[in-house]
């Protein structure tokens, strides 16, 4: 059965199901007279035989066959578009280089033009395949080859599906294998997304947190360890920790890029470079670098580049650490902003939308909730990427689509949530100075300043007695005869407790 016939059958089945769920008899009779228009088709062939494909699509038989064999997840599970666009970059680079090794320039120019349209997103609708296919990504590589081939044929005035004058394997896939093109596209896609989306977003959040650390540098508050009262610090010092977490996150991500920039192209089937020419790998990497503006190079060992994806596992390890930082920062700000009257209430967070369908006036820390949910998703993706990376069997890793899907999702979610958290939360945070001061004055841990003067045991006695009696530190210190009010006022000054003496 062709892909078109199957689609028509599913449409009819869905229509029948609607009738069965309660449509009137009149409606049912009316439906029975409705004719579903037949989509125009053309016939294409692969090594398994002939298949019908939609006439208005550039893909061919191998793509249609994959649609038939891998009905897993539907449109939501399609191969990530950044991978498709990365393939366009690679196919253009290969065509340009292959002109040095026998590819007719006229064909190369048509392939290059079609590949540009892939990169620009003009042909996105022609890439229907899902992530859950062969672990090498062969079907997606052929999807790209077929689309570029047919579009190039169209550019040259030929007949779609004829494979003349541009053949998907012989010309678009010249000097290539799915085993080296898919990992190359993986690296290009992730490299572009990290540089264009993630790093700018992290730097934006870092700047916003730094601005708040400066704004809050003179606000003294009580610290908390184990969620219990501790000694004072400034709110600026507290936020400076978040700034450093972002600094380190950016540095960690950037430190993974040298391995990510190594491309498998030129390794072909198992890493030996069979069916390529000397210099092809280096020239393709240099051309990809020129097209992307990123410092891609050929992988020094193609066997590793095909059989293992440690570089992407490493990238996601850095992303996972970013997620860990996001979870901590989001939770801290959420809890510091709890209230407004019965929580900590040290921070006021921007009020962006109503928070409850039943409690009037309630507003929630939704940006904190969103960024911590993103963090949880990325942590889950870390498991999937680790499992995928560990499944390189002999000369080929066969979890490639899963790996790149999760790395790209984590990259996108972290980037978008960082921007959202910055714009709709961090930039609008206000310190509640009066409440911060009130909480600090009530803390028993200010007694720590007395350790050098009266010793740990006496200081502990004052704190425990004050806690038991519900009194203040100074009241119990004087009552116990350990020191005077003047001594207490002289020695217990929060502003003198913010660093080494």
UniProtKB/Swiss-Prot annotation:
Annotated site location: Important for catalytic activity: 369
TM regions (residue ranges): none
Encoding gene per record: fum-1
Any one of the GO BP annotations: fumarate metabolic process
Keywords: Cytoplasm, Lyase, Mitochondrion, Transit peptide, Tricarboxylic acid cycle
Active site: residue positions: 226, 356
The keyword Secreted is annotated on this UniProt entry: no
Enzyme category, top tier: lyase
Function: Catalyzes the reversible stereospecific interconversion of fumarate to L-malate. In mitochondrion, catalyzes the hydration of fumarate to L-malate in the tricarboxylic acid (TCA) cycle to facilitate a transition step in the production of energy in the form of NADH.
UniProt catalytic activity: (S)-malate = fumarate + H2O
Protein name per its UniProtKB record: Probable fumarate hydratase, mitochondrial
Record-linked InterPro entries: Fum_hydII, Fumarase/histidase_N, Fumarase_C_C, Fumarate_lyase_CS, Fumarate_lyase_fam, Fumarate_lyase_N, L-Aspartase-like
GO-annotated molecular function: fumarate hydratase activity
Family in the record: Belongs to the class-II fumarase/aspartase family. Fumarase subfamily.
The protein's annotated pathway: Carbohydrate metabolism; tricarboxylic acid cycle; (S)-malate from fumarate: step 1/1
């Amino acid at each position: 059965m062709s892909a078109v016939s199957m689609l028509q059958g599913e449409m009819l089945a869905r229509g029948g199901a609607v009738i069965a769920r309660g449509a009137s008899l009149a409606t049912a009779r009316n439906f029975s007279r409705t004719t579903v228009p037949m989509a125009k088709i053309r016939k294409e062939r692969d090594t398994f035989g002939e298949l019908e494909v939609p006439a208005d699509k550039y893909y061919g038989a191998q793509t249609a066959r994959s649609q038939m064999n891998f009905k897993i997840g539907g449109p939501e599970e399609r191969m990530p578009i950044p991978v498709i666009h990365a393939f366009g970059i690679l196919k253009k680079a290969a065509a340009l280089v292959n002109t040095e090794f026998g590819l007719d320039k006229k064909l190369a120019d048509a392939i290059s033009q079609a590949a540009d349209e892939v990169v620009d997103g003009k042909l996105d609708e022609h890439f229907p395949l899902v992530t859950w296919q062969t672990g090498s990504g062969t079907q997606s590589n052929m999807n790209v080859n077929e689309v570029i081939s047919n579009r190039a044929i169209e550019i040259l005035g030929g007949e779609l599906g004829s494979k003349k004058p541009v053949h998907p394997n012989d010309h678009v896939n010249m000097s290539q294998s799915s085993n080296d093109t898919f990992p190359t596209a993986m690296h290009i896609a992730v490299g572009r997304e990290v540089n264009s989306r993630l790093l700018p977003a992290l730097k934006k959040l870092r700047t916003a947190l730094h601005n708040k650390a400066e704004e809050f540098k003179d606000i003294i508050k009580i610290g908390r360890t184990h969620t219990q009262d501790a000694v004072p610090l400034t709110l600026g010092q507290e936020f400076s920790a978040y700034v450093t977490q972002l600094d380190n996150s950016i540095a960690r991500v950037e430190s993974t890029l040298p391995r990510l920039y190594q491309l498998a192209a030129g390794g072909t089937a198992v890493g030996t470079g069979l069916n390529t020419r000397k210099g092809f790998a280096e020239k393709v990497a240099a051309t990809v670098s020129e097209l992307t503006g990123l410092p891609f190079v050929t992988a020094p060992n193609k066997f590793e580049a095909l059989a293992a994806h440690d570089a992407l596992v490493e990238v996601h390890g850095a992303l996972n650490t970013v997620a860990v930082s996001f979870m901590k920062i989001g939770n801290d700000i959420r809890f510091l902003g709890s209230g407004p009257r019965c929580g900590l209430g040290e921070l006021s967070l921007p009020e962006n939308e109503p928070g409850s369908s039943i409690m009037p006036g309630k507003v929630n820390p939704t940006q904190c909730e969103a960024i911590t949910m993103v963090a949880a998703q990325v942590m889950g993706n870390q498991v999937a990427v680790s499992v995928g990376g560990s499944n390189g069997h002999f000369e080929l890793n066969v979890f490639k689509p899963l790996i790149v899907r999760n790395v790209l999702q984590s990259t996108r979610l972290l980037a978008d949530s960082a921007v959202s958290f910055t714009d709709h939360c961090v930039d609008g945070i206000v310190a509640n100075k009066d409440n911060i001061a009130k909480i600090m004055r009530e803390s028993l841990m200010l007694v720590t300043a007395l350790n050098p003067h009266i010793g740990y045991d006496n200081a502990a006695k004052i704190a425990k007695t004050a806690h038991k009696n519900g009194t203040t530190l100074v009241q119990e210190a004087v009552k116990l005869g350990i020191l005077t009010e003047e001594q207490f006022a002289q020695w217990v000054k929060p502003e003198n407790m913010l660093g080494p003496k």
